[in-house]
C-alpha cells in the first residue's frame, strides 16, 4: 500500500508487477536450479493450479493495486484491505465447509475494529468524508483475489517445497502481467526511467514484500490454515506505526493504543 502510493506516476503499474514477480522467479530459479529436476513431475501435475494461484495472489494483487494507488488514497486502500481476513473466513466457511468458532468470529471483528481505529486515526468523520472511485474497485478485486489465494494455498494440495512452489507461482504471476506491460509500452508509451528510487523500490518489492512476506505467509497458512493466518494482516497498521516511530520520528497517538487494545485480544480469540 505504501509503495503503491509512493511511486505513483513513476513506476508504471504493470511494469512494476512484472519486475517484482519476474525478479522473484529468476532469483528462485537460480538458487533452486539444482533441485528442480527431481520435482519436474510435480510441476507438470500442478501447473494449472499454480498458474491460477499465481494469477490471483501475484497477478490481481499486483498491477491493479499499483494502478489503484495512482487514483485513490492510502486510507481507502487500507480500509478495503482490512476486510480481507473476514472474506477469508467467509470463503473458507461457505465454499470449503470449514467450521468457524464463535470466538474466532469475535476475534476477527475485534481485530477489524482495531485496524479501522488506527487507519482513520480515531476520527469517524474520515469515513463519512471518504470519496470512492474506480481505483477502489481495483482494490476490492485485489482483496477478493488475495482472500481466494490464501484459502487456495491450504486447500490445493502440493508435493512441492515452499520455495519452489512460490517460484512457480511467481513465474505465472509475472506472465499474467505481460499483456498489460505491452499495453503500457506500445499504446500508452509509458516506459519506466531507471533511477536509484526505482532500484530501491524493486529491491524492497522482491526481497521484503515478495520473498519474505509471501513465503512466510504461505508457511503460516500451511500450518494454521487460511483463516488463522489471515489475522496476521491485522498487524500491518501496527508494524507501520512502529516503523514510523523508529525510522521517521513520529509520535504514537492515543488511537494507536486503542487500536492495539482491540487487535491483540482479537488475535488471541481468533487463534484459540
Where are these regions (language model features)?
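Specific transmembrane alpha-helical segments of multi-pass solute transporters/efflux pumps
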Residues: 1-3, 29-81, 117, 206-224
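Hydrophobic/small/kink-forming positions within alpha-helical transmembrane segments
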Residues: 2, 54-59, 63, 86-90, ...
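Membrane-interface helix termini and inter-helical loops of multi-pass transporters
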Residues: 2-13, 70, 119-132, 183-197, ...
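Hydrophobic/aromatic residues within transmembrane alpha-helices
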Residues: 7, 16, 20, 68, ...
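A helix-boundary/kink motif common to multi-pass secondary transporters
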Residues: 12-13, 73, 99-100, 161-162, ...
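Hydrophobic alpha-helical transmembrane segments of multi-pass integral membrane proteins
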Residues: 14-31, 52, 103-117, 134-141, ...
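Helix-helix packing/entry segments at the starts of transmembrane helices
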Residues: 17-19, 58, 62, 77-83, ...
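Hydrophobic transmembrane alpha-helices of multi-pass small-molecule transport proteins
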Residues: 28, 100-122, 234, 243, ...
